[in-house]
Amino acid sequence: MMKTSSTQEIKFVPKGWGFEKWIVNNKEYCGKLLYFVKGKRCSWHYHKSKDEVFYVQSGKIQVFYDDNDEIYNNGILVAKSIILSSGDNFHVYRGLRHQMLAIEDTELFEFSTQHFDSDSYRIQKGD
């Protein structure tokens, strides 16, 4: 016999860079749809517990990442970066500092372990 479950309410979270739609967040996994407005960026941050993969549905986004806290040193970019387009994905392991900057309006999916607000350690504020 097939198990069924009730649908969950999708949580809408406005952000300075766009918004998140939380499709699911439970003890097993988390799935979100993220929308970034062109020219906007999230904070430079990391997670001690969360492991996440981003999949770009549409648009173009630059991901900055590094194991160190500094993204810039004396105005010079010291973090690594990659530009992702539709169909690309990027894995953010626990502890990896990261930030996303939308080159175009961008829609992406986040697949991760469970999300806890207390597990976001912001180093530099975003939009």
Q: Where do the language-model regions lie?
A:
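Double-stranded beta-helix
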Residues: 3-4, 8-9, 13-14, 69-73, ...
